[in-house]
C-alpha cells in the first residue's frame, strides 16, 4: 500500500508518550549543511515559569521532531497546565476535571505544529529561544481544542488509542448515577474543555515573550488560522449533510479539497509555519513561497491521514480499523471509489458508508473496493504531487532562508507524508 522511494531512508520514531510509532523518512540526497543562523534580538521571555530554553535549542538543532524536541514541548505543556490549574483550584475541585481531560489528550501526538512554527521562525532568521518555545506550545493547545470538538462532531469513540473525552465524561455520569443524559453530559464537558483549550492557546501565544513588533507581525496569521479552522469545521459538517447524488466527481472532489484545505492543511502546517516566519520578519516573496510549501504539504498530510483512516494499523493509529468508513467521512478516497467502481458496487459502498454497525467483513469489502477501483492509487499519486509541489516552493525560497532550517523542512515534508500514524 505504501511505496517508499529508494531515495528515502526509513526510520522509526515515537510520539511524546513513547507510543504510536510512525514512519520517519530522511532524504538521502539532501545532506545536512551547517549554516550560521541569523538571529533576532533577545526577547523578554514569557510571564509564566519558563522551561529550559537551552534544552529547546539543543532539541531543535538535534532533530526536527526527535525525542528531545518532543520532550521539551511536553515539559512546556505540563508547566502551562500546572499554572492554569492554580486558577481552577479555587473555583471547585470538580473544575480540575477539565484540566485532567486536556492533559490526558495532550500527552500524545507528534508535535508537528510546534515543529513547523519553530522551523518557520528559524528559517526566517529567528531564534529557538524560550519565547518561541511558548509560541510553539500554543499550537498544541489550539490543536487540542480542535480535537476535542472534532471528536464530538464526529461522534468518535476513541482518540489516540483511549476513549474520547466526551465518552469518558458520559461514563463518569453513569458510574455516579447523575441525573439527566450521560451523552449530553459528556458532550457538554468536551465542548467546555475544548473552549478552555482555546483560551489557554491564546494565553500561551499572546504571553509567549516575543517582542511587540514580532507579535504585531505574527498575530494576524494567528487570528486568521483560528477563523479559517472554524469555517473549515463547519464546511466539514455541511459536506457530510448535503446530498452528493446530484454532484459529479469533479464537484465532489472540489468540496472535499476545500474541507481539507481549511479544516486541516492550513492549521496543521501552513499557518504554524507562517506564524513563526512572520514573527522573524520574513519578506513578502519568501513568505509566499513558504505559504505554497505549507499549503501543499498540508494537503498531502491530510490525504495521508485519510489513507490511514481506512488502511491504518489500529495498534499504531490508536483508531479502530476502518474508522473513517464507520464515521461516514467523505474523503478523496470516497470520491475516487464512487467514480471508479461499477454502479452496483458504488451503490452498496454508499449504503454501507457511515453505518455505526459496520461489520469487519463489510469493512474489508469496502477497503478492497477502494483498492480495486483505483482510488487508493489516485490518492497516493496526489500525495506525491502535493509533496513535490511543496518541495519545489521551498526550493524557490531557499536563497533567502537559513540553510539548516530548509533541510529540516525538507525532512519534515517526507516525515509528514510517509507515516504510519
Sequence positions of predicted segments:
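Divalent-cation-assisted or electrostatically stabilized phosphate/pyrophosphate-binding catalytic cores
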Residues: 160-194, 245-265, 288, 314-340, ...
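C-terminal helix-coil-helix/basic helical segment that borders enzyme active sites and/or dimer interfaces
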Residues: 125, 242, 274-285, 308-316, ...
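Histidine/acidic-rich helix-loop-helix segments that form or flank divalent-metal centers
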Residues: 210-230, 235, 247, 283-286, ...
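Inter-helical turn/loop segments and adjacent helix faces that build the functional surface
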Residues: 123-128, 203-221, 241-255, 274-290, ...
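Short glycine/serine- and small hydrophobic-enriched flexible loop segments
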Residues: 118-122, 147, 199-207, 274-278, ...
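Short hairpin/turn module used for nucleic-acid contact or packing/dimerization
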Residues: 363-421
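Active-site alpha-helical segments that house and flank conserved acidic catalytic motifs
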Residues: 132-162, 220-232, 266, 270-277, ...
